A protein has these predicted regions:
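Charge-rich, low-complexity N-terminal segments
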Residues: 1-82
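A short, solvent-exposed beta-edge/loop patch
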Residues: 134-185
């Protein structure tokens, strides 16, 4: 009978051994979950600042290759900063269409974008903001520009400067969009 009690003792010892039960499994996962939560919280950190770019080289390149003189945004108020800039054009010089796009962050950290192209306003509008609907006119400097609503609900201003077409849009205020449009010369 001594052998039977030994088997019962071994069975009882196995049954209550730590780590061999569901509860033991859960307790062994607790440190792992804590480490994962701490890693996730540590990785969040502070939001990364928006980088600023110099649109000067893109402006110069677009003006060089465009068959019509392209204007460019002049000085903007306060803490506006360019955060994106690119030129879309076919290869070779003096070939159309050339489109210069520059994105800005306003003083209120709202986005404003200017698109300058050598195509008529209607073609540039269709190419860059399909589905925009007319929404009256607004004063820009000494002239009036056509106002539109984009599919995202943002205001868009469209006008001409010399022979070039200019579109200004974004989630910035109407006043900021008008300032950006007036700065294009």
């Amino acid at each position: 009978m001594a052998g039977v009690s030994t088997q019962a003792q071994e069975r009882d010892a196995r049954r209550w051994r730590p780590g061999r039960s569901f509860i033991g499994l859960l307790w062994s996962l607790v440190p792992l979950v804590i480490v994962i939560v701490l890693l996730v919280l540590w990785q969040k950190g502070a939001p990364s600042p928006v980088t600023s770019v110099d649109p000067g080289p893109d402006i110069a390149y677009a003006q060089q290759i465009s068959p019509v003189p392209l204007p460019a945004p002049g000085p903007l108020p306060g803490n506006w900063r360019a955060n994106s800039s690119h030129v879309d054009a076919p290869s070779g010089e003096k070939r159309s269409p050339v489109t210069l796009t520059i994105g800005y962050l306003t003083e209120e950290n709202k986005f404003a974008e200017v698109v300058i192209g050598d195509r008529p306003v209607a073609l540039l509008l269709t190419a860059t903001q399909p589905g925009a609907t007319a929404d009256g006119t607004v004063p820009v400097g000494a002239s009036r520009w056509q106002a539109y609503r984009t599919q995202r609900g943002e205001q868009l201003l469209a006008g001409t400067v010399g022979k070039a077409s200019v579109l200004v849009t974004g989630d910035a205020s109407g006043t900021d969009l008008q300032q950006l449009a007036a700065a294009v010369r």
